[in-house]
């Protein structure tokens, strides 16, 4: 699996999280694991994606156009548009809470309190609960 395919899977996963589609979220996660993607790598991409969504939401609130958002974030305009659409599915508080939960999971994994695979799985279950 290429890096861009993995990033795309994370994008799809966040969409499923926003729609509270737990089965789809977990299927995407298990598929990534099956393809030898590390849970830690998945966690890092989740954090990156949430941070991007937060940044887009912030710029959108300031009335920035897709072109300006793309330029400021150093991404192609179509990516900025996709991020903007996805950002509408989350509140700022939800995104902040998700980033914080990712940080706590990261710490629990690094301190040996939980395995990386289970830690990320529990996080995804938490994010996608109704």
Regions found by a protein language model. Give the residues of each.
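Long, charge-dense, solvent-exposed interaction surfaces that engage phosphate-rich ligands
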Residues: 1-12, 16-19, 34
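Helix-rich C-terminal "collar"/helical-bundle subdomain used as an assembly and partner-interaction module
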Residues: 21-130
């Amino acid at each position: 699996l290429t890096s861009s395919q993995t990033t795309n899977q994370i994008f799809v996963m966040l969409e499923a999280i926003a729609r509270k589609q737990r089965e789809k979220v977990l299927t995407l996660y298990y598929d990534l694991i099956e393809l030898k993607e590390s849970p830690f790598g998945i966690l890092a991409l989740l954090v990156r994606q949430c941070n991007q969504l937060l940044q887009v939401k912030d710029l959108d609130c300031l009335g920035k156009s897709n072109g300006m958002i793309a330029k400021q974030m150093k991404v192609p305009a179509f990516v900025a548009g996709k991020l903007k659409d996805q950002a509408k599915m989350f509140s700022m508080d939800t995104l902040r809470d998700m980033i914080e939960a990712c940080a706590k999971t990261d710490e629990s994994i690094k301190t040996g309190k939980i395995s990386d695979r289970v830690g990320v799985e529990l996080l995804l279950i938490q994010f996608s609960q109704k």
